[in-house]
Amino acid sequence: MEQKIFGQINQEESGSKKNIYLMQPTYMNSSSVHFPYAIGALASYAWQFDDIRENYALKKCFFLRNKTEEVLNSLENPFLIGFSCYMWNFEYNKLLAKKIKGRYPNCIIVFGGQHIAPGEENLIKYPFVDILMHNEGEVFFRDLLRALANGTQLKEVNNISFRENGQTVATPVTTAKDFNFPSPYESGFYDKLIEDNPNIEFIPLVETNRGCPNHCAYCSWGKMNAKVRLFPMDRVFRDLEWVSEHKMEFLGFADANFGMFPRDEQIIDKIIELYEKNGYPVKFQVSYSKNSEDRVFRITEKLNKKGMDKGVTLSFQSMSPTVQKNIGRSNMYIEHFKTLLDKYSQAGIPTYTDLILGLPGETLESFTDGIETLLEYGQHTSLFVHLCEWLPCAEMGKKEYMEYFGINYSKVPLNQPHMSRIENEEVGEFSRIITLTNSMSHDDWKKMNIFSACVLCFHHLGMLQIAALYIYHQKGIKYKDFYSSLAEYLLSSDGAASNALKKIKKRLDDIIEKNSAVVFFDDRFGNVAWPFEEYLFLDIITQKDLFFKQIKNFLSNYIDDDALLCELLAYQSFIIKQINVSHKSFSGSYNWKDYFGALLKDQKDAVLKKEKVHYVIDDNRAAVTWQEYARNVLWYGRRGGKNIYTSEIKEVIGDERE
């Protein structure tokens, strides 16, 4: 598109045009926030048409959770206000919409987005909402504006629900035939946002395709957009050029299965070309396809060589065949997972695996066994365990599905790790965390959370990974037994690690009984929401020496050679990153580096040899404050296992020693 749509609009007088406002409020993550992509896409499509521009003025778009009175006072005779609704803004949107309706009763309030389920339920619940928009909205939002301008009956507009003569009406939900949507980047939609907010680090989200062929019960993606449609390559390339030219450091793709199509390799080549030319974008993140392994490997290999990718997902969601059947998902065979894990490891590409806690059919035993399987097959780099959330547009959100599997949830403050807390917030948002099913009691759910927090903190974040590997390979103790015993020990004793884990246990009780939050805030680590395992790690790392002194008593149950145990713990402490430490050294009597390096590559014949060693680490990027450490080392570095040293460990031979 040669001419910016919004560059033209902003120069026009609104005159007798009807005023339109669009809302997609979200939380800040520290100083960064995503561009409001949904409303940008809707506006860019609608305002390319002459009749829309002749009848309507797009007055302003809101993307932050401003005080509702400030928003209300900024409105000028609003004709229609569209709200893009998600779990992180639904309560705010309702509060603001109700206030707007009170002051401007003739203003048309439209709710759409991922949180608006099919049907008329939200119209019945919320009388201040006039129209619901379902599924994707570009074409149908334009059609709605046309119908309102021309006096056409709303029944002629697809994908909406509304009231008529005291009754609710729902029109057919379809997918638009026209997919030639203009880009909100190229249209100029974001230009004024950048100009008006120079201190905000905007994060761009680009679509190369839309849709998902999978039909996972916990997700609304495939249910709402099953057919995958491709945006033209010239549009994709121009979006990437815009991101690079505007010096955007981080780039995310909205694709559900990137790597599915052969052209995706060309897209990656373009990103790398722009990075080499302009230095931007620096980091790239996307959800990869699980069915295009060779292509995804080539893509991630290219990105990894440039240091642009945080790793590739090798996900299961659950290791239980029963659960997989219940959620409509098929996983790769575990032996094939092992092959892929080895392939990526040999190429030096980080991998991470996702599990979801609380899926229907999961039991305490199947959950802990599943994590044991992943560890035994070599996933030591990065594991994420997400709490299962009830979503209104997902299959799991249906009443019949919930009743069949005995699903119940706890309505808790918003589960959005790493968001910033807003002081004196007018209204909070909520997540609906599944804490009860036919196969999982509340007590089971709490035990699963304690177990996963321990595995993720002490193993995948590295706090006791070395010890667990040694005990598994030398003593034959299963990982799940080790970490279950560790949790019991910490909860029954006092000390550096015990306090934080006890706090998590208390919080889990409060989630069930009082609907408390599933994240922690701690001023030591900035205004950031931390999931359980990250909070546990951060609390312990601030008192690392006390922790290792305490934990020695527990480990002595498995390792009776006191000298070896002391040296193993010293090496474990040595490889964990700290603040204000740019140089450190270690001397020992065993080939720790080679031994554990081999075990992490799943070389089961690795031998721990008694030999004098001296290791050094130099890190000129060491964090100097706990807030910097929490953000850069743990939050940003977690997917690549960057909170522990690996390749940075250098062995010093003979006269080279300090």
Predicted regions: what is each one?
Residues 80, 108, 237, 242-254, ...:
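Conserved C-terminal portion of the radical SAM core fold
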Residues 1-22, 31-32, 53, 73, ...:
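Radical SAM enzyme core and accessory elements
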Residues 45, 54-173:
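Glycine-rich beta-alpha loop elements in corrinoid/cobalamin-binding modules
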